[in-house]
Amino acid sequence: MTAGRTSAVEKEAAKKKEWRPISYWPFIVPAMVVVLAVIIFPWAYTIWMSLHEWKVGSPPTFVGLANYLRLPTDARFVESVWHTLVYTALSVALPLILGTLAAVIFNTKFPLRGFFRGLFILPMMATPVAIALVWTMMFHPQLGILNYLLSMVGLPPSLWVFHPATAIPSLVLVETWQWTPLVMLIVLGGLTAIPSEPYESAQIDGATPWQTFRYISLPMIMPFLFIAAMIRMIDAVKSFDIIFAITQGGPGSASETINLYLYSVAFVYYDVGYASAIVVVFFALIIALAGALLHLRQRTHWNDAGGSA
């Protein structure tokens, strides 16, 4: 009798198991349609356009890989790639260093700490256009406050964004000012998660503040630094609004990144096919940079528990 009931139960369970996957489709199909419509189709269409010579007002003509072969010989594109790499490297490194230093400071107790922490994160809340307008006035060679501050400490004035040699460093200064607070918040979250026991042991052993940071804090916050670096890298490499609002890629093309050159090709010269090829290569560059950062994480053995081997 028991065996008969068991057999019936098993048959019923087998039927339910057999039909269960079918019930999932009404929930999966809408998501698949959205993915196809929003992600896959635009990329497929972009790749298709990159294989054609297509200028606004004329029909597309298939040219194969001609647009891609044109890229290495395009001096302006090569220059924009170099500008993008320099801008990205500086815009990642400086906020990481300064944000970590700020996090260490705000992790200690001092009067009005909450007030100063609130002031510190204000730059990341401002809109890019407002930031660009304020910094453009500050960068003015004659009327800007930055040259006034330089004169107060006996340093010569600078042309800032109005000179090719200092345009990108000046833009990095704006990027650092805006996004150092974000790095500070991420790293501060890691510091506050560290238990107090290792610090107490280090204090008993007579460790200096630098030794405490180097051998306790820094290994523990490595995963948080990686997250901050990844966020900053992706954001910096595709930066457009602040650069366009302050310099528009100038003087000349001294601060023109890939994004700005892409904008010129697509919306000034209306070369849609060539612009599509730039988009594909630009996306590949972002993937390569993200992959390099992930590889660095694996090589240094960063893990969820913190630490670097």
Where are these regions (language model features)?
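Short, Lys/Arg-rich, polar N-terminal cytosolic tail immediately upstream
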Residues: 1-19
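A structural signal for multi-pass alpha-helical bundles of membrane permease subunits
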Residues: 19-309
